[in-house]
């Protein structure tokens, strides 16, 4: 059984109760590590994501902008190793609903292009290589807590999304849907500029 040992998420996104005409600058940093005890030995997986965003707040409740993600994954087994690098480039729209002076909720809807490149090794010999590109869309709701002067904390417990990949060197088309509410947690800081 896969066991999640550590999830670290640092989100730096714009103040959820933002003012019309301001600029949103922010992003996420995520790190995950897992260890699986299998019959063939231990398998360790580490992943890292960096996701900056820039947007324009065209209404007190609405923001639109561009987002980018760069990801790296490494999986080590007893005699095997897998490395994968990926990126996403797209646009997002955010709707924010203030609940009080202290609390707001918001949802980000993003969509765009994604690409991935991976390599698999067995006993340090390259056994396969893959390149893929496709499209993604995701929806992430969150809670904002205003701490002081626009600085605050963001809390998210997952989201939902859909991704497609077409691989260059093999005849494989991949489509994935995820719904991970309650399976992940992201805690971050935010500031409106």
Regions found by a protein language model. Give the residues of each.
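Internal, hydrophobic beta-strand segments that form the core of beta-sheet-rich folds
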Residues: 156-158
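Gram-negative (and chloroplast) outer-membrane scaffold detector with strong preference
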Residues: 22-23, 29, 33, 48, ...
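Individual transmembrane alpha-helices with interfacial aromatic-anchor signatures
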Residues: 174-182
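Cleavable N-terminal export/targeting peptides
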Residues: 1-22, 193
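Flexible loop residues that form catalytic
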Residues: 9, 67, 160
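Short Gly/Pro-enriched loop/turn and capping motifs at secondary-structure junctions
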Residues: 148, 160-164
